[in-house]
Structure formats: structure tokens, C-alpha cells
Amino acid sequence: MIATPIRLAKSAYEPMIKFVGTRHPLVKHATEVVVHPCATNGMLPGSKECIPVSKFMENYKPFRVVPIKHSANAGLSSSKTSVFVNRPLQKDELASIFELPARFRYKPINEHELESINSGGAW
């Protein structure tokens, strides 16, 4: 007979997970219905002052799509929603992200980061 299973059976089981700190206390919730802190005039849920959801939703109309009206002088670009206007750059404006200061530019991925990404984050 192999001694290992016997030795394992004699020792008490010790879980491998160690929880830090003490147990969290159980929170006692109120058993009676109380007023919500944001409720107006101390209204309780289900009271006669509350409006049922079905009655509240009667006031809402379903969403309706309204087509965009284009101006007549737009010409060929009437199908677009925005129009490009060629103008000179103003103060603190840039024409490209490559004109940004070095601290705001995108940093290229180095070989170490690339290997970590390709391996799925495993080392």
C-alpha cells in the first residue's frame, strides 16, 4: 500500500485560499416600507398619491424619426450632415496630431509590451 494517501487522509484539510481581514457584518434591512430619501412630500411607494406606471407612460409618445431638412444652397453636399470649411488655423489649433508636444503624442509599443500582448498577458 502507498503511504501517501494514508498520510494525506490523516492530516486535516486546510484550504489554500486565505481571506484577509474579518468577516463583513450582516446589514439589517428595514422590514417595513419607508420613505425614499429623494421622495417629495414623504410619499410612500404604493400609496394613493403615487401614479401607476401604466398611467404615467400614457403621457409619453413613441419615438418618431424626423428627417433632416437640408438647405437649398448646399448643392452637391446635401447628403452630408457636415461640411468642410477650409480656414486658417487659429491660436492653439493644430493641423495634425504629430504637431503635438512630445508628452501628448502616442508612444510606440516596445518589444517587451508586444511580447506580453501576443502571449495573452502571461509571462
Curated annotation (Swiss-Prot):
- GO BP terms, alphabetized: 2-oxoglutarate metabolic process; tricarboxylic acid cycle
Its main localization is mitochondrion
UniProt keywords, alphabetically: Mitochondrion, Transit peptide
- Transit peptide, residues from-to: 1-8
- GO terms under cellular component: mitochondrial ribosome; mitochondrion; oxoglutarate dehydrogenase complex
Where does the UniProt annotation locate this protein? Answer: Mitochondrion
State the oligomer form and interacting partners.
Answer: Component of the 2-oxoglutarate dehydrogenase complex (OGDC), also called alpha-ketoglutarate dehydrogenase (KGDH) complex. The copmplex is composed of the catalytic subunits OGDH (2-oxoglutarate dehydrogenase KGD1; also called E1 subunit), DLST (dihydrolipoamide succinyltransferase KGD2; also called E2 subunit) and DLD (dihydrolipoamide dehydrogenase LPD1; also called E3 subunit), and the assembly factor KGD4. Within OGDC, interacts (via N-terminus) with E3 subunit and (via C-terminus) with the complex core formed by E1 and E2 subunits.
State what this protein does. Molecular adapter that is necessary to a form a stable 2-oxoglutarate dehydrogenase enzyme complex (OGDC). Required for incorporation of the E3 subunit (LPD1) into the E1-E2 core (KGD1-KGD2) of mitochondrial OGDC, and acting as a stability factor for the fully assembled complex.
Question: Which gene name belongs to this protein?
Answer: YMR31
What family is reported?
Belongs to the alpha-ketoglutarate dehydrogenase component 4 family.
Q: What phenotype has been reported when the gene encoding this protein is knocked out?
A: Decreases OGDH activity in vitro without destabilizing the catalytic subunits.
Would you say which domain of life the source belongs to? Eukaryota
UniProt miscellaneous comment: Present with 2050 molecules/cell in log phase SD medium.
- List the protein's name: Alpha-ketoglutarate dehydrogenase subunit 4, mitochondrial
A molecular function annotated in GO for this UniProt entry is: structural constituent of ribosome
